[in-house]
Amino acid sequence: MTGTPPPSRFPEQPIPPWRRAVLKVGSSLLAAAGGGLSPRFALDLAHFVSANITAGRQLVIVSSGAVAAGRALIPPLPESGGALAARQALAALGQAQLIALWQRFFDRPVAQVLLTHDDLRNRRRYLNARATLRELLHLGTLPVVNENDTVSVDELKLGDNDNLAAIVAALIDAQALFIATDIDGLYTTDPRHHPDAQPLHEVRTLTPEHLAMAGDSSSTVGTGGMRTKLEAALKAGAAGIDTYLFNGRSSDVVRGLAQHRLRGTRIHPTCTPIAARKYWLRHAPVEPGAILIDAGAAAALAQQGASLLPGGVLSAEGDFRRGDMIQIATRSPDHPPHPLARGLVQYSAADVRRIAGCHSRDIQPLLGYTYGDTIVHRDDLVLL
């Protein structure tokens, strides 16, 4: 569905407050007619990002466009992009151009983050990616994420950056996913062929019927259509994240977003972010082994919602690795270990044994490296 009916067909609606969000920008909004990249639509989107950062919010951009940028630097390839190796070469050539496009709009550092889905499926790499993005946001930089198309074979597929944007939104505990498209939002049918197509300004629950409405259309420069955007909304919704589809080619629409007004489609999540994360933490498979903690640490976790620090750790059982889901248990002289919580551990069992009972500032001297002050962060922990 790629028609562009008047924006007024989508009624204006308020956007609930959010603290952290992901903005996904597709190739069709960045590609220049004669090849390469154009700042035409990116400028309005940059104003949206800048206004929210100035207001104290945090944003990550997931941006396509590297392959489109690369095409302008070498002789033309067939419309399909040629062999996989050629597309990967185009991505390598164009990635620097893509980051340069975004950097020109901001007076703060823009950080390039290249990810594959393997980075986010592997628990240890997942933790590393999340820690990096959080630190970049903490430092006040603007992370710009893209698929690592140069080395990823399976990742060069339809709509991958749409899905990546949803995964990144969950990764950083975002409250909103904004997907900039070249159409106004979701319709009951393809408005290019059906003038009576009705706009859907709000979707409470995505259904197979909605996916069927979207079809599988895509632009000539990108690799995704409306269907993949709805699939991304499903992923985001399962993590408790609102998704907003809007026309990134409309200056009025983008300016409205900066004032928390949407003319487009809002897709509601299926649960709250906290409920989604806690459900996953509670039900994800647990690796063999456990961390045994003292009464003080147990009270801090149970009564104060604190993170697990090394000072309250007595010992570690088993051979778990960084990123594993492990059990946290209390131990006292008169009672056997009692399960208290479970969570994603930042250090391996061997490391936990070495730093058990020490102050967080001693982690670096003892191990020679550090993954942070906590053994299990409170965001990665759920009480039993």
UniProtKB/Swiss-Prot annotation:
It is found in: Cytoplasm. The keyword RNA-binding does not apply. It holds the Pfam family PUA. It catalyses: L-glutamate + ATP = L-glutamyl 5-phosphate + ADP. Keywords: Amino-acid biosynthesis, ATP-binding, Cytoplasm, Kinase, Nucleotide-binding, Proline biosynthesis, Transferase. GO terms for cellular component: cytosol. This is Glutamate 5-kinase. It comes from Xylella fastidiosa (strain 9a5c). The lineage of its organism: Bacteria, Pseudomonadati, Pseudomonadota, Gammaproteobacteria, Lysobacterales.
